[in-house]
Amino acid sequence: MARVFHVAEKVEIPENVAVEVDGLRVTVKGPKGIITRDFSHARGVFIRLEDRVVIVETFVADRKQKALVGTIAAHIRNMITGVVRGYRYKLKIIFSHFPITVSVDEKNKVVRIRNFMGEKSDRIAKIYGNVKVKVSGEDIIIEGVDIEEVGLTAASIERATRVTDRDRRVFMDGIYIYEKGEAL
């Protein structure tokens, strides 16, 4: 099989977005905010800015390096989408007998879940990064510019209400992700 020595992937930059590349550190600025990400763990990968295009490339193209180039390009695309449109996850509060109360503590960056399965103590889920969490009725809406922080926060809330020692087909109480995508 022929060996490929150069693999590059290009990411187009929209007009209302500014991208700065400093070695393997990429900063993306847009209407919704700023995201900085360090890709210094990626050995043998180079990132450069040319006109309105970010080029991610490698010159030693084995299977892992090819995958790494694609992964970094996808991360940069997600960063651009985040600063232009943002990301939103929606979670549903589901209970059958004990009414669950959810409140957001902005100061301590946590979500407090009260009366889950009739428990006396609160369950606590962490809010990651600069993510906005809003509770409206039986829905929890999580919005932010970094897809990883939004996803981590949603997973933290879902994991905090996991039912362990009961049959999940019967005890369906909890908070579950039902929609995720771009916030428009």
From Swiss-Prot:
It holds the Pfam family Ribosomal_L6. InterPro entries: Ribosomal_uL6-like, Ribosomal_uL6-like_a/b-dom_sf, Ribosomal_uL6_a/b-dom, Ribosomal_uL6_arc. GO terms for cellular component: cytosolic large ribosomal subunit. GO terms for molecular function: rRNA binding; structural constituent of ribosome. Keywords: Ribonucleoprotein, Ribosomal protein, RNA-binding, rRNA-binding. One of its GO terms (biological process) is cytoplasmic translation. This protein binds to the 23S rRNA, and is important in its secondary structure. It is located near the subunit interface in the base of the L7/L12 stalk, and near the tRNA binding site of the peptidyltransferase center. Belongs to the universal ribosomal protein uL6 family. Part of the 50S ribosomal subunit. This is Large ribosomal subunit protein uL6.
